[in-house]
Amino acid sequence: MAGGFRPYDQDSCPNLTNSEAPEFSMSVVCKTEPHYFHPQTAILPSVQYSHPYHHYLSQFAPNFVPYYYRLLSRPIMKQEEMDIENYINYEVAAQQTMMRQRTLKPLGQLQIQMPPPIIVNQPVKPVPVKAVPVRRSSPPKRRVINAQLVAVATASGGIKNIEPRVEPLPRLEESFKQQVAKIQKSQHHYEQLFGRLTSMLKTLNQRYDNDAEDVPAPPSKRPRHMSTSSSESHIPDTASEKDEKDTLVQYPHRVQKEDGSAVYVLGPNGTQITAHQYGEVFWTNAPVATRCLLCVVFSSDELATHTLTGKPSPAFYGRERPPKLQLDQRKVDDIVVCVRNRTGGKERVIRATITTKCADTAKKYKRRAKKAQKVAIKEEY
């Protein structure tokens, strides 16, 4: 059919082509496009025919009325263009699909995002790798630990027993059994003795460190009633004991010499030390003061080779060692008197401290001797 609708205009087409009279004619001659072409009124390029479109329409369809005749204004005809609404709807649908996929399969937050590949125009040169020669050493030797060969198969397939032949032990003699019994008996005795000594040393150490309370004194022995004819024997000598106590209270006593130096007399036996030595003694408690006075009055050699009583130690019963010498009892008594008057300690605590000090000094000398022997052996090698 013809292109866009144009109202009939007598001015635009005054003459008909093949006939002068306005009658029906089938000859149609296409004319050129006029200069007033409007793109909104035609989809295709408009073509001017010899007769108007409505003239032919009235001839073939006299009762046909186009729908746009009923409108107030004629419709605007546009050429085919891009549908913006469909394009927007397509983009929205694509975004919704992508969000739905992410919701169903969320990406991990800690997923490592790899950077985009770097496009290198130049070819990558391979880095030369130096070949490292592999050292083929001999396999490690097998170590066999605690292996015992029990049997070996012979050439014929039999099993040969190779258990070592152990000679039977000789019969035990009766004298040997008696010696073993004696050793067991003495060992039991030593265990009991060492147990007592360990507890005693522990108690002495606690007393020396003032960690334990004073143990009550052992009960006094029952008085022995001796029958005598003199009635004076039953009267205690209170006067002599009181005079002795008064005499001992004055110690330690400071004495000024003619040359101007001062000395201290520790007890009634006349044991003396200088004022400087007396000032270096710590009088905090009885054990500490006793050890300080022992180091001043006696030398280290005397303390290592002497004991308080000079008797062999019961700890070495059955294997007695040579007994040590006894310390000078006069000096020991002066030390006991001095410490008792200054600290108020008990005599048995002071004497126990003297025994411990002698043992400690002897151990110190033994350790020094062993150390010197080791050094001498190293020098020889």
UniProtKB/Swiss-Prot annotation:
Gene Ontology CC: chromatin silencing complex; nucleus; polytene chromosome band
Ranges for region Disordered: 210-245
Domain BEN: from-to ranges: 268-365
Gene Ontology process terms (BP): chromatin organization; heterochromatin boundary formation; negative regulation of DNA-templated transcription; negative regulation of Notch signaling pathway; positive regulation of neuron differentiation
Record carries keyword Transcription: yes
Keywords, ordered alphabetically: DNA-binding, Nucleus, Repressor, Transcription, Transcription regulation
GO molecular function: chromatin binding; sequence-specific DNA binding; transcription corepressor activity
InterPro entries the record matches: BEN_domain, BEND6-like
Location relative to the cell: Nucleus
Keyword tRNA-binding carried by entry: no
Chain's role: The heterotrimeric Elba complex is required for chromatin domain boundary function during early embryogenesis. It binds to a 8-bp sequence 5'-CCAATAAG-3' in the Fab-7 insulator or boundary element in the bithorax complex and contributes to its insulator or boundary activity. Elba2 can act as a transcriptional repressor and binds the palindromic sequence 5'-CCAATTGG-3' to mediate transcriptional repression.
Quaternary structure note: The heterotrimeric Elba complex consists of Elba1, Elba2 and Elba3.
Domain notes: The BEN domain mediates DNA-binding.
Designated name of the protein: Early boundary activity protein 2
Name of the gene this protein is made from: Elba2
